[in-house]
Amino acid sequence: MRWVRAVFALVFCLSAGGRSGVAQKTQAPASATVTVSAGDLSAQPVGANWTSYNGDYSGRRYSTLNEITTANVSQLRAAWVFHPGNSQRLEVTPVVVRGIMYITSANDVFALDAGTGRDVWHYQRPVSSGLLDDAAAHKNRGVAVWQDSVYVETDDAHLLRLDARSGGLIWDVEYAEKSKHYGATSAPLAVKDEIIVGSSGGDSGVRGFVAAFDALTGKQKWRFWTIPGPGEFGSSSWPGQAYLYGGATTWMPGTYDPALNTVYWTTSNAAPDFVGDTRPGDDLYTACVLALDPDSGKLKWYFQFTPHDLYDYDANETPVLIDTREKGVTRRLLVQANRNGFFYVLDRTDGKFFGATPFVEKLNWAKKIDSSGRPVLSGRIPSAEGTYICPGIEGATNWFSPSYNPSTGLFYFMALESCNTYFAKARPFTQGETYYNTGTKRPPDEQSQKILLAYSVPERKLVWRYPQAGRGDSWGGTLTTAGGLLFFADDAGSLEAVDATNGQPLWHFNTGQRIDASPMSYAVDGMQYVSVAAGSDIFSFSLPH
């Protein structure tokens, strides 16, 4: 094992503020030299490879692998465990291409032999100081891969390009100013010849955006600001300088429809939280899904889930792309289980609203969603004395990943039954401080519960539910497979498998750690594996050899 300096494919660093990292390398297997093709990235659904955060562009987290089935999943056992060593709460979904797994932990990137868990190379970069909110916790959800390169966002909003063969740094681009308290927690998305990124910091008083960079050179190709500037459509919500710190950050990866050539990206809450006097109106484009042209960054359409959000109901949950046949008509849909407690169905070609139904029982901020897609409010808003509001600040669901199985026709996701008392007290924006006005508390007798839900999109109804034991404080998501299975991270620290048709429990493995990530599946030499980040470790499971 030897230490090497990062290998620079470009002789300059594109960011004057960039910090060099180092790559530690062991003997790499031959498959580490493969190139990730456009066909690999556009394959839908995925099989042996898992080429992006959600597996494929659609966001369905569905694997065609079927070696592991309802009949043999009880034999599943841990094949290997890898400990990155620098994070206690991993949130990464591994990416696997031809037997090589890429994971992140804080600002570090690892390449592993996906069959054994053996370390191939390790790129190290120090964590940043002086950050706020989620970025200060150095959370990172994974990488993007393109040709012979690996791309990662750092906690201080740099985009790095690494050599997939060695882990050497090729270039480093600062795409948002740390001095303004931008950060990043997401995995990038590779589309065509560009890498698309977002930012965190919506509760820290920043202006959100989605940006695309040339995958070869790192040069910015376009940037779409999610808070409109003066004179732009929607700017009436942002008087004076309010647009500069209005939030609408983009802290989860989007999805992409190659046939429509459209990227779908979601945005966070408006800032300040809980008090809306300084941001009258709908507060575009907060709590939205945006349909963007990946070639130009121009907005095609948008849909806002929670106009004038006072509850911290980010819309950053995955916008999943599915096709259904309803009444003899094939529909290209975008569906989302939203943090506000409603399940939305949209036409992804133009954003037309098809309907929204509640999926939790604890819901009192709105009475319903009307025929135009707007909420009919109940009048419950944060107050100085405190107001009991459901869902609570963590939402009826959150960023933990959903999945969709085309064989069952069911959409799976984790829901949270929980409420909070919301308090409001206006205060001015101060650079360098979080922009909460003011906060929430959980009532002493409030019992939160996670529930695994299966939802039929054509029928617009819940089909089955699987309540979880625990405190409702884990953040694990779901994976569904052609083996008739649904894997998910439960609230007790276990990876669990149930029958995707009816939710019947079939297998579980307790990791002994809280799971704040979502499972994925891949194959090496014809053998199927299921992998998940649990606590500070990566676990990979397979049937006995």
Give the location of each predicted region.
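Blade/loop signatures of beta-propeller domains
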Residues: 25-78, 226-233, 374-377, 441-442, ...
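Short coil/turn segments that connect the beta-strands within blades of beta-propeller domains
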Residues: 47-48, 98-100, 147-148, 192-194, ...
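N-terminal cofactor/phosphate-binding cores enriched in small/glycine residues
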Residues: 63-176, 480-481
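Extracytoplasmic beta-rich repeat domains
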Residues: 82-93, 122-144, 169-187, 204, ...
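Short loop/turn segments that connect beta-strands within beta-propeller blades
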Residues: 114-116, 163-166, 215-217, 294-296, ...
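A detector of repeated loop/turn-to-beta-strand junctions in beta-rich toroidal repeat architectures
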Residues: 156, 206-209, 284-286, 331, ...
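Blade-level signature of beta-propeller repeat domains, shared across WD40, Kelch, NHL, RCC1
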Residues: 517-545
